[in-house]
Amino acid sequence: MRVVLQRSKKASVTVDGEIVGQIPFGLTLLVGITHEDTEKDATYIAEKISNLRIFEDESGKMNHSVLDVEGQVLSISQFTLYGDCRKGRRPNFMDAAKPDYAERLYDFFNEEVRKQGLHVETGKFGAMMDVSLINDGPVTLIVESK
């Protein structure tokens, strides 16, 4: 499992001109799932992201988690994170999980994040989405389970 995490001042996702998810501040997650991922990977990433200290304390040091600052999470499914661009001019997405498996594991992942005590908003799995955010910092990290 691969997640691009962005600390966000605000974020939203729109499908067919309608906002389907938005947060006032917290983390925007682009979530990629490969065919080898399991519920164990999803739980690991959910716990890691929820407790990662990437928000500043009073001294400006990254010392607080999204839980500590009472932030929220906007989670977006993103199969293109497993695009392989090493050969040719078109990405190969063979490492991305099949949609039915990926959707089940993506839903499980979001529930695991909620179990950590976070409010989670999502996009629409498999849809074309417009994602808007103000990246805070900017702080952008890649978190992987393997």
Swiss-Prot record:
HAMAP family, sorted: Deacylase_Dtd
Organism from which the protein derives: Bacillus cereus (strain G9842)
Subunit structure as annotated in this protein's UniProt entry: Homodimer.
UniProt GO cellular component terms: cytoplasm
Example GO BP: D-amino acid catabolic process
Similarity-based family: Belongs to the DTD family.
Places the protein is found: Cytoplasm
Name by which UniProt lists this protein: D-aminoacyl-tRNA deacylase
Reaction catalysis annotation: glycyl-tRNA(Ala) + H2O = tRNA(Ala) + glycine + H(+); a D-aminoacyl-tRNA + H2O = a tRNA + a D-alpha-amino acid + H(+)
Location of the motif Gly-cisPro motif, important for rejection of L-amino acids: 137-138
Gene Ontology molecular functions: D-tyrosyl-tRNA(Tyr) deacylase activity; Gly-tRNA(Ala) deacylase activity; Ser(Gly)-tRNA(Ala) hydrolase activity; tRNA binding
Cross-referenced CDD domains: Dtyr_deacylase
Function: An aminoacyl-tRNA editing enzyme that deacylates mischarged D-aminoacyl-tRNAs. Also deacylates mischarged glycyl-tRNA(Ala), protecting cells against glycine mischarging by AlaRS. Acts via tRNA-based rather than protein-based catalysis; rejects L-amino acids rather than detecting D-amino acids in the active site. By recycling D-aminoacyl-tRNA to D-amino acids and free tRNA molecules, this enzyme counteracts the toxicity associated with the formation of D-aminoacyl-tRNA entities in vivo and helps enforce protein L-homochirality.
Domain comment, as recorded: A Gly-cisPro motif from one monomer fits into the active site of the other monomer to allow specific chiral rejection of L-amino acids.
Assigned EC number: 3.1.1.96
UniProt-listed InterPro entries: Daa-tRNA_deacyls_DTD, DTD-like_sf
Chief location bin: cytoplasm
The entry's keywords: Cytoplasm, Hydrolase, RNA-binding, tRNA-binding
Family matches, as PANTHER family: D-AMINOACYL-TRNA DEACYLASE 1, D-TYROSYL-TRNA TYR DEACYLASE
